[in-house]
Amino acid sequence: MKMKTVLVIINCIFLAIGNCGGPLMMRLYFQNGGERIWFPSFLQTVGCPLIFFPLLLSFLRRRRCLEEQETTPFFLMKPPLFIAAIVVGLLVGFDNYLYSYGLAYIPVSTASLIISAQLGFTALFAFFMVKQKFTPFTINAIVLLTGGAVVLALNSDSDKLANETHKEYVVGFIMTLGAALLYGFILPLVELSYKKSGQRITYTLALEFQMVLCFAATCVCLVGMLAAGDFKVKHALFIFKNRVIAGEARDFKLGESLYYVVIVFTAIIWQAFFVGAIGLIFCASSLVSGIMVSALLPVTVILAVICFQEKFQAGKGVALALSLWGSVSYFYGQVKSEEKTKAQDTQLSQLPVTDYVA
């Protein structure tokens, strides 16, 4: 099995864990007394220091392979890519806020169906920004996955949360749709940053990009927390000594200890999502990453039904079938495309070589 295939599988696993587990952890936070918006936004990217460990291993491996007189820098990222990572990170910070705001007022299943729209946005932006080519299988997958989202939308009228006003629901819906639009722009922007960086993008470099991106997004959310009054201590970075957060922990319905368990695992799980999403852009393309996100959304819906007793209507079953069909269609198209490319390469290699004398 080729290393690239292994990386695709690993990143798909990370993406599945983060894409399915992240919204559930945030719903657990809001359902049991969590009231902050910027704080869960902050948790989505604050786990970025975890990326330091694979980067350290990569550095040690590079240094071991070099001769004694040669040196290797710890970070391979050059200024253009570093600046691009910061810009993308700022957008991710605001996207996190939009998504957290929406999830505070709408069920996970409803949020998932709205986020499905990001696939269409990703395809549109990828077409103009990185000249992403569409095959019939890709178009079929997009239509099926988008159709699944539409079916869910038509069956979400009874999904309002308890004690929720119509205004809160509408605002939550709009904010989540905005998150889908912005994320649909972010994925091709990352791919464009790779192409315009002037560097050969390796998986190590993709991880460095991810760490800088998440750090910038975390800073945005940290400023938002300060502005929203989420900190009541002199040194804002001491999360666990924060009077606002500590008070929320004491009032958490599952208990103070489980409150901290929830926020720690929320940070870890969301970091898995970002590593998987950015990794898939490196291994394949932004459109592949977007399709995988959309393909996993019905799984999130089913988990929400199981964990939070959200209603599972017939429309959600139809959406799940359409999503699976779309995913199979896309991957089948990828296999056929690779087979066609290999066949063409084989034909070219078998052409007779003749000497031409002028």
Swiss-Prot record:
InterPro entries: PUP_plant
Residues annotated as transmembrane: 6-26, 37-57, 74-94, 110-130, 134-154, 170-190, 209-229, 262-282, 288-308, 312-332
Activity modulation: Competitive inhibition of adenine transport by isopentenyladenine, kinetin, benzylaminopurine, trans- and cis-zeatin and trans-zeatin riboside.
Domain EamA: 46-154
Comment on pH dependence: Optimum pH is 3.0.
GO cellular component annotations of the record: membrane
Keyword terms of this UniProt record: Membrane, Transmembrane, Transmembrane helix, Transport
Disulfide bridge positions per record: none
Keyword Transport: yes
Similarity section: Belongs to the purine permeases (TC 2.A.7.14) family.
Record function comment: Mediates adenine transport. May be involved in the uptake of cytokinin analogs.
PANTHER family in UniProt: OS09G0467300 PROTEIN-RELATED, PURINE PERMEASE 2
Protein's name in the database: Purine permease 2
Lineage of the species this protein comes from: Eukaryota, Viridiplantae, Streptophyta, Embryophyta, Tracheophyta
Gene: PUP2
